[in-house]
Amino acid sequence: MQKLILILSLSLMFFSCSPKVLYDDPRKVETLTINFSSTDLQIISQAMVDSLLQSVITNNDNKPIIVIEEVKNKTAEYIDTSIITDSIRAKLSNSGLVQFGVNIDELDGQISEIDRQQNEYYDENLSVEKGKLAGADYRLAGSLISIDKVKKKLFKTKKDKFYKLSLQLWNIKTGVMVWADEKDIRKTEG
């Protein structure tokens, strides 16, 4: 009986000391480290979308079709840049001013679905015809880079991290770059 009480007491003490998990506002500024954060994602994606939507491509009556390539990670750290790409795509799509075509990464899936609908199990009047994919007007591409600096003095270390997101929009028909912008973020620690 005493062993059981001891085990229960230790278990209660162990679990009562565990950290509590709380939900927080995803738009709240995150300053836990100088590494890439959710705040950085929100800042750079919104800045790029705002800039692109003020460009000449959205000043006419037609909604241009854009294919977006995944942002390339040229930093020294692992950053899943698909979250940057997805955030920019969602914000642009929600603006209602542009449309998105099938990019190279999604093309195989799109072709497979069209091919699947061409068999005898589908009503030919309700199936998608081959050769009807819309071609894109523009291609959006870019990269994320970082520069890391560390300065050590006696018992103190100061770290500086600089991020730059660069995006370019290319007219597919002419091969001309029609828009480009960059967003910088600098963080220091120590």
Task: Label the model's feature ranges.
Residues 2-8:
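Sec-dependent signal peptide recognition
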Residues 22-27, 114-118, 153-156:
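Glycine- and small hydrophobic-rich membrane-insertion segments that are intrinsically disordered
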